[in-house]
């Protein structure tokens, strides 16, 4: 009996010593969250005389918190212009926010450029097509390092060093710098000013490009207004500069609990042809309704940018878009270029 008691005591001492060497916790390790979205479309092109259905895009996202940091990755498979499917790393972000200085965040990877109102993924927009300003006048994606500082509940600052505009692998030795200030003067208004500077042409650092971009978001009751202005230039040779400017405005009005109407006007003046390859002025008007239902799961992207509009799980959007160019641009059925075109889109977006 005495021997058995000694054995129990010795086991207890051994267990206590092991517990001192290793912290015992009953907290569960945070799981990896898997989310994503799928997009199906029906398109009509008046000038090209084409129409068809496409299962256009699937995006799968992984989110893993780890203490003060998290990892977010998104793989996107989409159809290109030739109808071939291609998969790319759309986002890959390692982010760290220290507990003792949680107003600072350091992030590295590939991420959405903190500019403007529009984004590249369909669930993050209110209308099923992107503007000319988003496509040409400013970067949509950056690959590099980002520092975010929350100076106050109303003021946020960003600084970014990246490879360049929408490039995953650097095409020259220089780097692109971005600085942004975002201010909330009243709870339903957000104002942002962004400057971008750096070489963007392949194999040379001499042709520096600069961009000044400002954006305004108003989220008031049933109305959302998103607007942006872009002014840019690039040194071409010697002291010569190519310039461009553009503006886009989007208005969304909620007319019922699950129904809204969106309209957008977009103008981009590429008078030197640097961005589009042809000196021209591009304009577009897009109008259409959106029916939406349920709320998508919480994640790194939960709302339309700078608004309280929570991403719906299901959204059915239709739009008619009229495009104009000061030069023949839109190919018709015979291959000839026309100066105007009208397209129609019916898009289903499902977030899972």
Feature-to-residue mapping (PLM):
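Outer membrane beta-barrel
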Residues: 21-166, 173-178, 182-191, 250-262, ...
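N-terminal periplasmic/intermembrane-space "pro-region" immediately following the signal or transit peptide
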Residues: 5-44, 297-304, 347, 352
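Outer-membrane beta-barrel pore domains
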Residues: 46-48, 92-96, 110, 119, ...
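Intrinsic disorder/low-complexity segments
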Residues: 5, 15-19, 34, 53, ...
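Hydrophobic alpha-helical membrane context
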Residues: 14-15, 69, 276
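Short glycine/proline-enriched turns and hinge-like loops at secondary-structure junctions
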Residues: 85-87, 170-174, 206-207, 240-243
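Compositionally biased regions
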Residues: 4-8, 12, 19, 191, ...
């Amino acid at each position: 009996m005495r021997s058995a008691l000694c054995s129990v005591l010795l086991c207890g001492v051994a267990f206590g010593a092991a517990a001192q060497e290793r912290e015992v916790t009953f907290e569960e390790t945070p799981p990896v969250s898997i989310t994503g979205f799928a997009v199906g479309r029906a398109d009509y092109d008046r000038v090209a005389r084409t129409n068809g259905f496409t299962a256009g895009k699937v995006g799968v996202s992984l989110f893993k918190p780890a203490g003060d940091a998290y990892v977010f990755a998104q793989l996107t498979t989409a159809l290109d212009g030739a109808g071939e499917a291609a998969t790319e790393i759309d986002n890959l972000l390692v982010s760290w926010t220290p507990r003792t200085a949680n107003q600072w965040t350091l992030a590295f990877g590939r991420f959405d450029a903190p500019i403007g109102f529009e984004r590249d993924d369909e669930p993050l927009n209110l209308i099923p097509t992107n503007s000319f300003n988003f496509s040409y006048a400013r970067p949509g994606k950056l690959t590099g390092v980002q520092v975010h500082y929350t100076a106050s509940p109303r003021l946020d600052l960003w600084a970014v060093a990246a490879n360049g505009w929408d490039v995953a692998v650097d095409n020259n030795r220089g780097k692109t710098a971005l600085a942004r200030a975002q201010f909330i003067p009243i709870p339903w208004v957000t104002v942002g000013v962004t400057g971008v500077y750096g070489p963007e042409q392949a194999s040379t650092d001499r042709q520096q490009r600069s961009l000044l971009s400002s954006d305004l978001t108003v989220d008031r009751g049933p109305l959302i207004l998103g607007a942006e202005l872009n002014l840019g230039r690039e040194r071409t040779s010697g002291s010569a500069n190519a310039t461009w400017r553009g503006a886009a405005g989007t208005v969304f009005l909620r007319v019922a609990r699950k129904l809204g109407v969106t309209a957008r006007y977009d103008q981009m003046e590429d008078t030197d042809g640097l961005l589009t390859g042809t000196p021209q002025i591009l304009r577009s008007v897009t109008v259409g309704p959106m029916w939406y239902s349920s709320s998508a799961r919480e994640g790194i992207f939960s709302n339309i940018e700078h608004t309280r509009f929570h991403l719906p799980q299901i959204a059915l959007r239709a739009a008619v878009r009229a495009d104009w160019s000061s030069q023949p641009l839109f190919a018709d059925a015979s291959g000839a270029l026309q100066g105007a075109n009208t397209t129609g889109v019916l898009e289903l977006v499902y977030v899972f």
